[in-house]
């Protein structure tokens, strides 16, 4: 009775195409199930990656950290972002999920932290994204012995830890709410 009244079809069972790992069958099943709700379909063909060399001016320890993590070259959009940022241009990068956007901003930030003592403030809308970014920065810093410190500064950061974040962080990762509630009203402490 509930399914008949529901807007959504029943959830797929834990067997069949998904359990078998057959993606084509899964997609075909979803298309059949949601045929009245699908208004269009577009398939984009696979495209080979385009690559570029690491920038020669990249701080050597940062280049070594990338190599330690298996990154010996950049995608062309990462290198293009590097070139624009280093030239002082405002830069927006729009690429698909999992295409390496993180390095587009982490490379210039880490390079500036290592060569100029620069600090950075990262804003993310969710705690999960913030934690992922801190983990990524920490792993890269540790891989190259960079000593760059990234910390989360959010509503769950204990009061005694907030001072440490303010004084020791090279990269502070927070969210818009915390920026307005906990950082801007106390900007003189930063």
Predicted regions span which residues?
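Conserved P-loop/Walker A NTP-binding site and adjacent catalytic elements of P-loop NTPases
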Residues: 53, 57-190
